[in-house]
Amino acid sequence: MARPDDEEGAAVAPGHPLAKGYLPLPRGAPVGKESVELQNGPKAGTFPVNGAPRDSLAAASGVLGGPQTPLAPEEETQARLLPAGAGAETPGAESSPLPLTALSPRRFVVLLIFSLYSLVNAFQWIQYSIISNVFEGFYGVTLLHIDWLSMVYMLAYVPLIFPATWLLDTRGLRLTALLGSGLNCLGAWIKCGSVQQHLFWVTMLGQCLCSVAQVFILGLPSRIASVWFGPKEVSTACATAVLGNQLGTAVGFLLPPVLVPNTQNDTNLLACNISTMFYGTSAVATLLFILTAIAFKEKPRYPPSQAQAALQDSPPEEYSYKKSIRNLFKNIPFVLLLITYGIMTGAFYSVSTLLNQMILTYYEGEEVNAGRIGLTLVVAGMVGSILCGLWLDYTKTYKQTTLIVYILSFIGMVIFTFTLDLRYIIIVFVTGGVLGFFMTGYLPLGFEFAVEITYPESEGTSSGLLNASAQIFGILFTLAQGKLTSDYGPKAGNIFLCVWMFIGIILTALIKSDLRRHNINIGITNVDVKAIPADSPTDQEPKTVMLSKQSESAI
């Protein structure tokens, strides 16, 4: 390819970034040592950039205002865009180093702590429903009362999501994490004082606090992944953060039937078993709150990706929470995703809440196996989540993957519905696992797809709205499916969910895939976001600009 010539005059069209004072730098130069070689000799005008001391600044000024000059000798002229302020300065001006991108080892600690206290919160959500008949007999209340111990998680989320996301956007990640972990711990201790048959209201109070804690937990996976992890691992990190919540649901399906067996004839033993479960949960929640206070940091020293560097460079006063909400609701693809995510996740919440009742309808006395089926459903979903996260990091095929998983979840729900009453419980284990693999595996897909199509809006806000939609659909689906199950049997309730999931497939197919964050990370910018050129050891190779006589005029 020909080198740039020495003709005077503007070689770049007005309005292009090169016309605003960008310097072409040799692609192979290491960070901090890039150089521009002027025309008057091999080292006549060479100067390092990226914050290092400069030589021949006057010569550098000539590059900006004078004739086009060739770069350092290379077979081809390959350059990446560097703001002129970083490479050439007026005499006496202070150097302005470029923002660096790097990965912090602490990111794994932050992810682990979050995943663990999210696990405990999810465990407390499902610990009543999976042994609903036991708590129904102990407290002397109806099944609807026990269902509300689960649905209060969904109910509390809807009105509190907006102040919670505002807090996350304005006060930061650490304070939000402390509130989530702290309220989770407090709610667990309150429930320890409810182990008497007339104190159902106390256990409801503790569960309400845990449900408020959930508001400060569910919106964090995509924010933690974006703030702490590089572009090649962000989807996997998000899936891992969601995995903690799913694992908590799995443990909630497994442990309560084992720790609190159905001993209605011995109330004292039953109370002792419930107390053991509550105190054990409180001890773990307390330990995790302490770890959160010690080790959970706001953000790493350096941004992990080009997209985060661009966001951190934006002036804070330009951010408006109300404007961000309006932008999200004007984004038609996001609105469609909001509905489809709510349908899928709401169906999962409903199935999880009513699983014990569905199983006991056809398999009397199988409380323990009902918990194991729930465990199978969630563990299979955990595998699905990780595989989907790895697949997204590798392919970036967000819409295609989301649509395929949605279709397979629908097929799994249909199979589960029509095999539940075959009287072979092993079949329910298999179909429950298939359903969980795709239905639970969908959860991180929705988060990451939302971040992609709404960038640069806050990840916490988009995730929070997705979760609010899930809670609303979860309440409606649980009430409707519970009523249908009581009046007509589990099959009627499950068919109700199948119809809604089919609608979700149609709406998912209509979503336009605009991967804004991914485009920033690979160097493609749009009018809304300015990418900051900074090297990262894990980022994709920076895009290059090939300069020649023909390409200069074509730009």
Curated annotation (Swiss-Prot):
The chain crosses the membrane at residues 100-124, 143-170, 173-192, 200-228, 234-259, 266-295, 332-362, 367-395, 398-420, 424-453, 462-487, 490-512. Ethanolamine binds at Q214, Q471. PANTHER family: HEME TRANSPORTER FLVCR1, MAJOR FACILITATOR SUPERFAMILY PROTEIN-RELATED. It is linked to Retinopathy-sensory neuropathy syndrome: An autosomal recessive neurodegenerative syndrome beginning in infancy with areflexia and retinitis pigmentosa. Nyctalopia (night blindness) and peripheral visual field loss are usually evident during late childhood or teenage years, with subsequent progressive constriction of the visual fields and loss of central retinal function over time. A sensory ataxia caused by degeneration of the posterior columns of the spinal cord results in a loss of proprioceptive sensation that is clinically evident in the second decade of life and gradually progresses. Uniporter that mediates the transport of extracellular choline and ethanolamine into cells, thereby playing a key role in phospholipid biosynthesis. Choline and ethanolamine are the precursors of phosphatidylcholine and phosphatidylethanolamine, respectively, the two most abundant phospholipids. Transport is not coupled with proton transport and is exclusively driven by the choline (or ethanolamine) gradient across the plasma membrane. Also acts as a heme b transporter that mediates heme efflux from the cytoplasm to the extracellular compartment. Residues 1-52, 535-555 are annotated as: Disordered. Gene3D superfamilies: MFS general substrate transporter like domains. GO terms for molecular function: choline transmembrane transporter activity; ethanolamine transmembrane transporter activity; heme binding; heme transmembrane transporter activity. The lineage of its organism: Eukaryota, Metazoa, Chordata, Craniata, Vertebrata. This is Choline/ethanolamine transporter FLVCR1. It comes from Homo sapiens (Human).
